[in-house]
Amino acid sequence: MAQFAVIGLGSFGATVATQLIELGHDVIGIDSEKKYVENISEQVTHAVIADATDEHVLDELNIKNCDAVVVAIGENIEASILCVLHLKNIGVEKIWVK
């Protein structure tokens, strides 16, 4: 069983997270919007309201221990790029970006 983090829990991210759970993996779901985290909290291993553009937050959540991270941040390309840079900085090796 692999451990994944899904950052951005809108339509795409939530679908990816639930599919990974159905495949038997552990999933940490992360979003800055409370409503998205609440919508998926019962379906994933852990759901966290957090700012994924903050490198310290990603480090505190031990995201580097995940087998892979899916970045599914919606329309905000700057936030998506910043998140990926921080993930690389903390040592995440497998990053999949929408």
State the predicted function of each range:
Residues 1-98:
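Cytosolic regulatory regions of ion transport systems
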